[in-house]
Amino acid sequence: NSRDRRPYIRPVARVELSEKDVKKRTVLAIVFLAIAVIAIGYGLFSLINTQPGWVEVTGSSREPNVSSDVKLMYDFSRSGGSATAENKQLSLIYTQACRDAHVVFSPDEPTGGIAALTAAPGEAVKVDPALWEAFRLLEEHGDRTVYLAPVYTEYARVFRSEGDGEAMVYDPAHSEEAAQLVRELASYCADPEHIRVEVLEDDSLRLVLSEEYRAYAAEYGLETLLDFGWMRGAFVVDLIADRLLENGFTKGYLISFDGFARYLGPGEEPFTVNVYHKRGNDLYRPAQVAFEGPMAWVRLRTYPAEVRDREHSYVYADGTAVSAHIDPADGMNRTGAEDLLVLGERC
């Protein structure tokens, strides 16, 4: 009808749904939902619960700590149903140990013993027993590496360089100006009359500075006078290992990104470690070492083998490497080999 202004509506077909099909669909929907719930539940269970076997234990502190520098692998094979509870306890101890290791050995930690020593030269400062023991060992062996902090600061400029041209500006091996600077710094760092830490009784230390070095440090803005440098990882790993052993955790190992490792005790099977060596610009594996533990494993290298090695080394396009292994006598990067492997009881 031409006068009918109602919009045209297409006819709707009526389809009878089978009651039988609706029931099938409902059953299938319930089955799929149940499968999804089970899968999600299993996933959550796997995340929350620790399965027997080797597991990487992680720290959970939001405060500055060394957990990014160290990896802890632990064997829960014999833990059975108690693996989750054991992992939780281990994680708490490991988290606190990683935080303590940062506070004790980081020169940048304002609440740590190194900062306290630097802030109060000439005064006896009570420190963590681990820091006291570290300085006692250095004194016993006549090692003055810890006093090279200002020299490390200069080499850090080389390691952060974006190219060979920039690196050569800061590298004492290529720049006479840079070489003169590190020699001048090393002349203070190497001389116990200018700087030394005295090991006192009752876990106390005293930083002794000459007036000349104090004036020099103030004039040139030297903020960090003490830094364990490349050997920091050794003391960090030993501190954490000692904490774990004190609490009865012996079925694992710790390893730092820069080559320090502690195997806490004998495992279910002997530990096997690959030994790598640099040949030209390539790394190859000449051997494997198998042992039952406990044991400390130290592998030093002058070249980057891991991503984070760029923090303490630089390699020129011609393959020449610069590392943080500094001669205290003159501040120059000097090593007798490209890599070194040492085994012992402690790092």
Regions found by a protein language model. Give the residues of each.
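Mature catalytic core of soluble alpha/beta enzymes
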Residues: 1-347
